[in-house]
């Protein structure tokens, strides 16, 4: 799939390479089979070069950040994975003594960025203080919590266009944000970095939000157990999926080692050795029960790789 010459070229341009790695070691669900190669570009230039080389050779690939919103087959996978692990640089620009523009590369931890900015008195990303994952994944899916979403603070995003091999800038309107969606999910663009606009606020008020959001997350979500986060998108504003699943008596229900969380029924956890089949079977079971009872079609929120 990747020739020795290409390996040497990628390495020379700043990519570490690992072979036959199991993706379960790179995901929060702890499920995922082996891939032929994982590439770890150390700079954005190395990332762009790797993308260009793979596209030119028609080598299939996927991008992984912190692996927190993925459900991956445990069978051998036939694509290359590019990790944004080392793409964690940030730049800061103050505006008018009140606003701050932050440019963060795609691999920056979203929760770490939230805390960093909050500690300096900048408001806007408090909602992300407990969201696992990277900036790239957060913008890709317009992640949100507690009334906030990525679209509220994004100014623009730098992307690599797979169609013509050019680096481009997309503004907020170009990104076509929706509920847990963006134009990035259509597959033509790979996110490189994003600029955010934050507002100065009282530190006391910011810290109060952080404490509130963090406490609620710890109390209500199984964040200490392997999962892929919320399994289903909310189909409409007044339809609460976790509450619905709980009311159907499914809290704690298991198939194999995959279990509907006893803490929050909107999550499926890995009790230890769950398989991809266990998880998918449980998802399909819940979807069928909800459809039969409420005539609502649930959509899965995490990406599924197979």
From Swiss-Prot:
Biological process, per Gene Ontology: cell division; cell wall organization; peptidoglycan biosynthetic process; regulation of cell shape
Keyword Protein biosynthesis: no
Location in or out of the cell: Cytoplasm
A Pfam family per the record: FAD_binding_4
UniProt-annotated catalytic positions: 180, 230 (proton donor), 301
Main location: cytoplasm
Domain of life of the native organism: Bacteria
A GO molecular function held by the record: UDP-N-acetylmuramate dehydrogenase activity
Keyword Cell wall biogenesis/degradation: yes
UniProt function note: Cell wall formation.
HAMAP family for the chain: MurB
Listed name of the protein: UDP-N-acetylenolpyruvoylglucosamine reductase
Source species: Petrotoga mobilis (strain DSM 10674 / SJ95)
Gene, per the UniProt record: murB
